[in-house]
Amino acid sequence: PRSKQRIIYRAFPSWFFDVQGSKPLMLEENEKINWFPGYLKHGRFAKNIEQAPDWNLSRDRFWATAMPVWKGDKGTVKVVGSYDELFELSGVRLEDYHRPWVDEIEFEIDGEHFRRIPKVLDCWFESGSMPFAQLHYPFENKEKFERNYPADFIVEYVGQVRAWFYYVHCVNTALF
């Protein structure tokens, strides 16, 4: 490091996407993609899938999309699926669902008090959600999404095969 100070590594509890369990389906779905140049299909992209570790979805930061996960004082975990569901649970609607405002939302279910875990999503999760999130699917535009998914054509810089396109493939293979 420039400062000559030692770096301290700390382990934090994290949330992971099970890439290992998804690899067979990800490789199967890769066979349906008409790659150009063709060597990417069984080369760079397939090798990236084969060698990928599980994906750490959570980050211990302030700036990013808040993970919609609340934990109860008895240990129950509640993943909230929409702003409407969060309103039903808490009675609170926000103008902005980022930190610190979303962190203030608490609610009770069957006598158990829930607080949001203070984690945010890896930015690649949002990037990988582009095919459906751009249409606000499944909350709106269901027919338009279903008519147009999956995409017929994607143009991207070859370096994004390892990054953006991998995460698009990862998220969408798991969901659809």
Regions flagged by a language model, labelled:
Residues 1-176:
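Structured secondary-structure scaffolds
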